[in-house]
């Protein structure tokens, strides 16, 4: 897996192409706002993963991203599969607001990952210490093992989705 984090509108396509030559899976992490870099990355995607926390504001932003994906699909005259990934979820309870948001996505025909990223210190620590959850020091950060298991479950689901998309030849969107 290759992660692309700091591309610009001018370099994003070349960065994706170069990464594809090096690895089977390329993840492009871009800001949530619509931009040419985001549109370019979407146009090259096998799967667009839209992040959403359990708030209506986040759900509204996710909906904007989904609309951008659908516009790009029309421009390119091809299907661009996407799914919503719920983030910073509580492992013990699912608040009513989150249930409502997930139901709205479901009713709109938007796929949601079965795996969510649970709100864990280890995931927040990545921004401070860098690297991945596997690189974190258990003396500095708690819950690494649970974060690794959560990340692994998500990785498995992403890979299975991509394999399914490739088998089916894409996904239809209106």
Region annotations inferred by a language model:
Residues 125-152:
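Inter-lobe coupling/hinge region of RecA-like P-loop helicase motors
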Residues 1-27, 32, 36, 138:
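P-loop/Walker-type NTP enzyme "switch/lid" segment
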Residues 53-54, 81-96, 115-127:
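G-domain G4 guanine-recognition motif of GTPases
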Residues 149-174:
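Charged phosphate-binding loop/patch that engages nucleotide di/tri-phosphates or the phosphate backbone
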Residues 101-134:
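Beta-strand-loop-alpha "switch" segments that mediate conformational coupling across diverse proteins
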Residues 37-56:
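Inter-motif core of Ras-like GTPase G domains
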Residues 62-77:
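Conserved C-terminal guanine-recognition region of P-loop GTPase G domains, centered on the G4
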């Amino acid at each position: 897996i290759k992660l692309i984090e700091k591309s610009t509108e001018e370099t994003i396509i070349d960065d994706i192409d170069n990464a594809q030559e090096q690895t089977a899976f390329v993840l492009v992490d871009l800001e949530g706002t619509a931009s040419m870099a985001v549109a370019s990355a979407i146009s090259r995607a096998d799967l667009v993963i839209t992040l959403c926390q359990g708030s209506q504001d986040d759900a509204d932003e996710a909906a904007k991203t989904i609309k951008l994906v659908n516009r790009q699909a029309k421009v390119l005259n091809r299907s661009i599969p996407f799914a919503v990934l719920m983030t910073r979820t509580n492992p013990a309870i699912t608040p009513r607001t989150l249930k409502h948001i997930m139901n709205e996505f479901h009713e709109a025909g938007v796929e949601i990952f079965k795996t969510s990223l649970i709100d864990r210190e280890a995931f927040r620590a990545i921004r401070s210490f860098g690297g991945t959850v596997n690189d974190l020091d258990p003396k500095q950060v708690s819950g690494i093992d649970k974060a690794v298991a959560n990340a692994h479950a998500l990785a498995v689901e992403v890979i299975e989705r991509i394999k399914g998309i490739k088998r089916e030849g894409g996904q239809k969107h209106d």
